[in-house]
């Protein structure tokens, strides 16, 4: 076991270590030639590693030379996905709003093979219409069962649908409005 003088730094430092500048070692006589050979071998292996090391995008499978380039490219993919997501959310919300507006304020009859939903609305009676469940079942003569409905106000009574149109090919459905509601309602706000 060696004893070290901890007050003297040279007692436990390596004896002579060559200085390495730009891949070349200086300061060792016979080790210098060996280190050059080792450096050349190490340098070639590093070049081979760099040739093999490619960074691949997981979305479009492009190869990039550095991880930084790949990161920037993947950020672009992230922005594209966020924009697509925002567009889909906005378009779905707009389609839902448009569909609801068509159900509430339809000016013509609407019929499709799964549901009969059309509403004729007077501005004064906007909140007094009933909207029936769209998953109603149908008989052979295309009349439907409306046992379930969605009231818009608590305490509302169910109204019966009125069929409009004479032909069997097109049946229109309007909702009856309540008879005791005045035609004109004031929209002035008063305290």
From Swiss-Prot:
It is found in: Nucleus. Keywords: Cytokinin signaling pathway, Developmental protein, Differentiation, Gibberellin signaling pathway, Metal-binding, Nucleus, Transcription, Transcription regulation, Zinc, Zinc-finger. One of its GO terms (molecular function) is DNA-binding transcription factor activity. Disruption phenotype: Reduced trichome production on cauline leaves, stem branches and sepals. Its main location: nucleus. InterPro entries: GIS/GIS2/ZFP8 (IPR044291), Znf_C2H2_sf (IPR036236), Znf_C2H2_type (IPR013087). Gene3D superfamilies: Classic Zinc Finger. Pfam families: zf-C2H2_6. This is Zinc finger protein GIS2. The lineage of its organism: Eukaryota, Viridiplantae, Streptophyta, Embryophyta, Tracheophyta. The gene is GIS2.
């Amino acid at each position: 076991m060696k004893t070290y003088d901890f007050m003297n730094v040279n007692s436990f430092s390596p004896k002579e270590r060559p200085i390495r500048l730009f891949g070349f070692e200086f300061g060792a006589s016979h080790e210098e030639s060996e280190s050059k050979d080792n450096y050349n071998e190490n340098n070639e292996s590093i070049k081979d590693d760099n040739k093999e090391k490619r960074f691949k995008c997981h979305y479009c499978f492009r190869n990039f030379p550095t991880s930084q380039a790949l990161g920037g490219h993947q950020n672009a993919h992230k922005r594209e996905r966020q924009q697509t997501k925002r567009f889909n959310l906005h378009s779905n919300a707009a389609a839902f709003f448009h569909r609801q507006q068509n159900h509430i304020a339809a000016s013509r009859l609407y019929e499709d093979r799964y549901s009969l939903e059309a509403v004729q609305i007077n501005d004064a009676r906007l909140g007094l219409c009933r909207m029936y469940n769209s998953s109603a079942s149908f008989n052979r003569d295309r009349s439907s069962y409306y046992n379930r409905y969605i009231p818009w106000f608590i305490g509302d009574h169910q109204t019966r649908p009125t069929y409009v149109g004479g032909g069997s090919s097109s049946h229109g459905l309007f909702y009856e409005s309540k008879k005791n509601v005045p035609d004109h309602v004031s929209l002035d706000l008063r305290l």
